[in-house]
Amino acid sequence: MTDPEISAVETVLDNGKFGTRTVKFETGLLARQAAGAVTAYLDEDTMLLSATTAGKHPKDHFDFFPLTIDVEERMYAAGKIPGSFFRSEGRPGEDAILTCRLIDRPLRPTFKKGLRNEVQVVITVMALNPDTPYDVLAINAASLSTQLSGLPFSGPVGGVRVALIEGQWVAFPTHSQLENAVFDMVVAGRVTETGDVAIMMVEAEATEQTWDLVRSGTQAPTEEIVAGGLDAAKPFIKQLCEAQVELANVAAKPVQDFPVFLDYEDDVYDAVEAAVKAELAAAMKIADKQERNDRTDELKDEVLAKLGEQFEGREKEIGAAFRSVNKQVVRESILRDKVRIDGRGLADIRPLHAEVGVIPRVHGSALFERGETQILGVTTLDMLKMEQQLDTLSPEKHRRYMHKYVFPPFSTGETGRVGSPKRREVGHGALARRALLPVLPTREEFPYAIRQLSEAMGSNGSTSMGSVCASTLALLQAGVPLKAPVAGIAMGLVSGEIDGQLQYVALTDILGAEDAFGDMDFKVAGTREFVTALQLDTKLDGIPAEVLAQALTQARDARLTILDVMAEAIDEPEEMSAYAPRIITITIPVDKIGEVIGPKGKIINQIQDDTGASISIEDDGTIYIGATNGEAAEAAKNAVNAIANPTMPEVGERYLGTVVKTTNFGAFVSLMPGKDGLLHISKLRSLAGGKRVDAVEDVVSVGQKIQVQIAEIDDRGKLSLVPVVEGDQADSDTAEAGSEEE
């Protein structure tokens, strides 16, 4: 066997005072039977393998490009054994799914249009510095392995994460550095023929520290700052693309001839355009989505019937051409007349509605509507021990704020599968979570696990941004003290030549059809002061800076309008629901934790059983006590304090105790965990109507609750008790006890 021919190239990204990051690409050693394979390294201690493979035969019955991106997180990469029952990795976690989406979004548009062969890119995380995010390295590795594969691919695509730290945009920041970042942004793009970088995808968010950093005087991530971050990412993207090209020039396979299946031929398009364009233009002015869709469906059926004989066997082409004509009609109306599908102006927002408390008994609920998009937000609060436990390669091991997004088929008037979330739903939930994370209270300020569910009740454009609005309302109604309300809006862009001039038109609050027919999907969420999350996907080779600035300005204006409407529904946290748990926080010495827990959990379980409260103990001695009513939580707090922060009991103090043991000379009564006293048989007369008591069991039994008072404490701390009865009986018994002893 001959030695493999290994080729490699590396590039060093300079972050100035923050040091350098070295990215290395290598091919020829691993996965040699894949069409293209690349090993990518970041600073020699993080290693990914990306392998691209194409199916041998096209799926000509598909009307889409069958591209699959898979990310495999190997736990050995971090020196861990999986925590599952079978100790295997199992299904991909949320981080892996989100990384798949990050790769798919910029890669998919770069394949040749009409390709129908199945293409699969598998990225395996093989070694990982726990302080290093691997997602942007995976974008570059997937791009390069695809370039080497011989597929018709117009890459390379470069991806970089830049974070705003101490006023500087830092490339490939570590998790430690991100703790001091104001804004975190993943940007992907490619180098154009002019040498400029065309941005294809952006995924960005403020951090959990942003609010405090801004309050301490750090520059807030405003729209202008975010636009500057996009420019700062371009040199790094260009550098990574050049490194990919250098290796591809040495190791890439020749581009193979793959059959291309165009959606339609020109003759079909011309016939469809002549037959239906005028009527389609009228149909696309119908404001109501359902009526508009019904009319376009009618027109499509008419065209199929009219042209079916002329183009026999080419019905799929007629359908595709119909969609293309529809797209052209919508775009021309926007570019020429500045009029949109539903008759709105370019910056107009659809009618807004917001209300809270729409579901009984739940801890918080809200309904947010923007036109035909309708989102239900529901908040649930619980003890911190109910926060999500994560067994992934990420340093995040538990998640206090969980945000789930559900998109049922009825939200678009269709039937379909319900159940486990698809990748799109995972992505939308993650986007809404990132938008709200910077304004959530800390664990110390609000010691609750928070689960937010966003349900799309109706969909016609940007349910993800609607989820942000509905969630803000529901959280406030649940009593969560947000630092500021957050709203989101989806922007669009249409470009084209009109009378020989290239025009760009930014659209506010896009419909579903405008999203499909436009050139950009741009979602922006934030407070009144700054941006908290941003997501951008574009089909263009580049967006001029002034066009992007205009879109950001329109988004800010729309966001402020939406926040005003939300404030009319609720503008500050309400009182917590009577059905939500009440949580009390206390701190005990660390060396007392064992005493509170007791042998095999005996003491803590007894406190929980006696009071009905739930208790969670942190390693630092912080104890969270939760109960559905304040009395139970207070009783549990007193019981814990009696053990961990004890005060010596005094004669005359009264307790509601529990009989834990009976003997022939009396009953032992537990006043609190770890503190018992003796109720002598002679003191039971008052409970027996003043009669002599021959057997303790005739008066009290184990488990019985009894009100007692401390009559005496001896030198060894032993407690003598007397029962408390109505009137002054307890006091007379105490006096009688003293006279008998005399």
From Swiss-Prot:
Cofactors (names): Mg(2+)
KH domain segment(s): 581-640
Residues annotated as domain S1 motif: 652-724
Annotated localization: Cytoplasm
EC code(s) of this entry: 2.7.7.8
One Gene Ontology cellular component: cytosol
Main location: cytoplasm
Pfam families attached to this UniProt entry: KH_1, PNPase, RNase_PH, RNase_PH_C, S1
Keywords tagged on the record: Cytoplasm, Magnesium, Metal-binding, Nucleotidyltransferase, RNA-binding, Transferase
UniProt KW Metal-binding keyword: yes
GO molecular function, one term: magnesium ion binding
One GO-annotated biological process of the protein: mRNA catabolic process
Residues the record lists as binding Mg(2+): D515, D521
Gene3D superfamilies per record: GHMP Kinase, N-terminal domain, K Homology domain, type 1, Nucleic acid-binding proteins
SMART domains found in the cross-reference section: KH, S1
Catalysed reactions, as listed in the record: RNA(n+1) + phosphate = RNA(n) + a ribonucleoside 5'-diphosphate
Coiled coil: none
Protein role: Involved in mRNA degradation. Catalyzes the phosphorolysis of single-stranded polyribonucleotides processively in the 3'- to 5'-direction.
Family (UniProt): Belongs to the polyribonucleotide nucleotidyltransferase family.
Official protein name in the record: Polyribonucleotide nucleotidyltransferase
Protein species of origin: Nocardioides sp. (strain ATCC BAA-499 / JS614)
